Amino acid sequence: MAEVASQETEFAAFAFGSVVERRDELEGRPWISYPVRVVADTPELVAVYLSHGTLLTFGDGPFSWGPHPWGPFGDRWQSAGILQLHRPGRGHSVWVLRDADTGAFREWYVNVEAPWRRTPTGFSTLDHEIDLVVPADSRTLRWKDVEKFEERARIGHFSPEEATAIRTEAADVAREIAAGEQWWDTSWSRWEPPAGWHALLQSFETEGS
């Protein structure tokens, strides 16, 4: 079963520019892990940056959910660099997606997932399948992968209580976006990484923490 975990705060905040691990943890093991750089780490906001070309490390199977879906695309992040925003305690993160050719802001991508759990090496979460896509300069959103989520719920990958909490989280953030009351500052769409924040190629220990 997946866990809808609460944010833990027993570890100190990470400094700007620190390289930390961002992982999806399934059944007590990393399903996918990759290094990111810290942009902000406060009680109200955690922001990390995933650079183009960064190494992706996939957990050793088998997993009840099967291999991580990014696996067929290789062990490097091939899209443009992504800023990921998370409000501690919320069950989603917001990814700032840019055009791979021009670098222009393209859309907000709301990734519904377990609230980030702080670890000694970074942050742990688990994707909950549902996504919301919000094009630049628009409050019109598109729901994505709802059918995949409902299938996981049907076959028991989420308990009934977990499934209800996930649906509620997705609906809540959708309402906030429609009302123009999203929690994140839209000026993050203009944020640029410092020069030199190139691909990260280190991996982290695969032991749970």
From Swiss-Prot:
Keywords, in A-Z order: Antibiotic biosynthesis, Cobalt, Hydrolase, Manganese, Metal-binding
Entry's EC annotation: 3.6.1.-
Cofactor: Mn(2+); Co(2+)
Residues binding a divalent metal cation 2, per UniProt: E129, D131, D145
Matching InterPro entries: DUF402, FomD-like_sf, Ntdp-like
Gene3D superfamilies named in the record: FomD-like
GO-annotated biological processes: antibiotic biosynthetic process
Catalysed reactions listed for this entry: cytidine 5'-({hydroxy[(S)-2-hydroxypropyl]phosphonoyl}phosphate) + H2O = (S)-2-hydroxypropylphosphonate + CMP + H(+)
Pathway terms, separated by semicolons: Antibiotic biosynthesis; fosfomycin biosynthesis
Recorded superkingdom: Bacteria
Activity regulation summary: Hydrolysis of (S)-HPP-CMP is inhibited by CDP.
Subunit structure: Monomer in solution.
Protein name (database record): Cytidylyl-2-hydroxypropylphosphonate hydrolase
Record organism: Streptomyces wedmorensis
